């Protein structure tokens, strides 16, 4: 299998190409049971763990680049713990009940949690897209690639129709609230979002490896 590489393409061009490939490779899921009508076997494609794993690692690489850039530009490194501990963000987290840890692992429950969690992160990625002052190519790459990852994971969930989409009104309200903060707090929130997404994806990566 060819590995995901950005040696030739910019992060945005790579991610746009990746999203196009995912969109054309995976059709809209059919209702449960229709795959086997008329005695035919399912032609619905299945995502290999390797492809999902490589995509997660690609996103983690872009996040790492953004965190490094913010650290160098704004001195927003690990010394912001006091401010971060006082944040009022409700960022997605992975817990034992999500079935993604080795102890109590449940593949279906875990896939649902990862997919829904990434959907919940979308509003925060919109925030990064609006206010991140570094390399915009990285923010766009993270957002586009995360959407591609959601598509991949939906194909692995047995009942994708049960994957709930976050309330857009709630998301819009949160985004408006975040926009009213001063620049220092915006930068602090952005590094927190990046750290939280990185943690979530690290847990997801370990789970994908044992699926």
Swiss-Prot record:
Domain of life: Eukaryota
Pfam name, any one: IL6
Gene Ontology MF terms in the entry: cytokine activity; growth factor activity; interleukin-6 receptor binding
Cellular component aspect of the GO annotation: extracellular space; interleukin-6 receptor complex
Location within or outside the cell: Secreted
Assembly mode: Component of a hexamer of two molecules each of IL6, IL6R and IL6ST; first binds to IL6R to associate with the signaling subunit IL6ST. Interacts with IL6R (via the N-terminal ectodomain); this interaction may be affected by IL6R-binding with SORL1, hence decreasing IL6 cis signaling. Interacts with SORL1 (via the N-terminal ectodomain); this interaction leads to IL6 internalization and lysosomal degradation. May form a trimeric complex with the soluble SORL1 ectodomain and soluble IL6R receptor; this interaction might stabilize circulating IL6, hence promoting IL6 trans signaling.
Described purpose of this protein according to its UniProt entry: Cytokine with a wide variety of biological functions in immunity, tissue regeneration, and metabolism. Binds to IL6R, then the complex associates to the signaling subunit IL6ST/gp130 to trigger the intracellular IL6-signaling pathway. The interaction with the membrane-bound IL6R and IL6ST stimulates 'classic signaling', whereas the binding of IL6 and soluble IL6R to IL6ST stimulates 'trans-signaling'. Alternatively, 'cluster signaling' occurs when membrane-bound IL6:IL6R complexes on transmitter cells activate IL6ST receptors on neighboring receiver cells. IL6 is a potent inducer of the acute phase response. Rapid production of IL6 contributes to host defense during infection and tissue injury, but excessive IL6 synthesis is involved in disease pathology. In the innate immune response, is synthesized by myeloid cells, such as macrophages and dendritic cells, upon recognition of pathogens through toll-like receptors (TLRs) at the site of infection or tissue injury. In the adaptive immune response, is required for the differentiation of B cells into immunoglobulin-secreting cells.
SS bonds (residue pairs): 71-77, 100-110
Record's protein name: Interleukin-6
Secretion signal, residue range per the UniProt entry: 1-25
Main location: secreted
Bilayer-spanning residue ranges: none
Gene3D superfamilies membership: 1.20.1250.10
Protein species of origin: Lama glama
Keywords: Acute phase, Cytokine, Disulfide bond, Growth factor, Phosphoprotein, Secreted, Signal
Biological processes per GO annotation: acute-phase response; glucose homeostasis; hepatocyte proliferation; interleukin-6-mediated signaling pathway; liver regeneration; positive regulation of multicellular organismal process; positive regulation of receptor signaling pathway via JAK-STAT; positive regulation of receptor signaling pathway via STAT
Gene: IL6
UniProt xrefs under PROSITE patterns: INTERLEUKIN_6 (PS00254)
